[in-house]
């Protein structure tokens, strides 16, 4: 059984989309992230140094997303995944990126990737 550290419904404004107006107006994206991580050592030591710092990873994701300008959610998701994998050396992650309200009649639309 693997342990999971997660961040759910992180909402960030960015330039994303293929239409002209989407290249000019920041839109909200929602991010869910699950990181496989062995939590045993952190549970034993009760030390932040032995786990993934939620605040730090959230700040890094926000900085990356706010500074990015992608046409596709797939590209944004891949960029976030690379950031997380490089920074935290996780064996695997599950990442969901969505654009709330992007499609009429749908709550949101997005992509889920596993790395």
Map each language-model feature to its residues.
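N-terminal, polar/charged subdomain of small-to-medium soluble alpha/beta proteins
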Residues: 1-115
């Amino acid at each position: 059984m693997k342990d999971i550290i997660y961040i759910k419904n992180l909402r960030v404004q960015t330039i994303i989309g293929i239409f002209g107006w989407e290249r000019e107006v920041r839109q909200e994206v929602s991010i869910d992230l699950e990181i496989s991580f062995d939590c045993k050592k952190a549970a034993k030591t009760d030390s932040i140094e032995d786990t993934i710092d939620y605040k730090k990873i959230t700040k890094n994701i926000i900085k990356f997303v706010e500074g990015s300008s992608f046409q596709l959610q797939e590209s944004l998701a891949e960029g976030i995944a690379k950031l997380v994998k490089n920074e935290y050396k996780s064996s695997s992650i599950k990442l969901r990126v969505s654009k709330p309200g992007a499609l009429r009649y749908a709550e949101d639309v997005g992509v889920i990737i596993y790395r």
